[in-house]
């Protein structure tokens, strides 16, 4: 980023967890919704596979791992580059848009191939949203709190996986395997999308600020006068 743009960022941005607690908290919440989407599927899909599609639960689990895991891994690989090109917020929104049809597809899937396709979309959703929330938190807190940012992100995501799995399992037990448990998914994806669109802010400026501060600290430490005094 040019120097004049860097200077324009400095007065309006401050690095730190405390300084950016509201945005950081929103991103923790968004990542919890990301984790919740996975929790629902992990609980209900193996049961749904056997009860409605005649598949063994271990085969359904294998399909889930392959279709979801492979796509998520590939998406994770490119998420950082995508967020650099189009921005963190747009990448996050794109991830939620890819996950938007997932609960509906599973609710009304006429055969198992539709469920596999939903898992592919979920893998894209997870790869883009989870990775981007990590990047955005690191942007906000700066170099001294990156470990804490990562820890809070992972804790929120996996706690949500567990709670959503528990909630979806309970709904499946007291109602039916579908559509009731997947109403949770609709709530999660809509909440994540709306928060990302209307409340989450772009964080790339914080990277520019960190670079500016690093350059300023370096230039202050290594002044030319240091050598002339020797």
Question: Where are the predicted features?
Answer:
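Flexible cytoplasmic inter-helical loops of multi-pass small-molecule transporters
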Residues: 2-8, 200-227
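Helix-loop boundary and gating motifs at the non-cytosolic
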Residues: 18-69
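Short hydrophobic/alpha-helical segments at membrane-entry points of transmembrane helices
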Residues: 27, 113-119
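Residue-level signature of mid-helix packing/kink "hotspots" within the transmembrane helices
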Residues: 68-77, 162
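C-terminal ends and interior cores of transmembrane alpha-helices
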Residues: 97-110
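Cytoplasmic helix-loop-helix junction between adjacent transmembrane helices
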Residues: 118-158
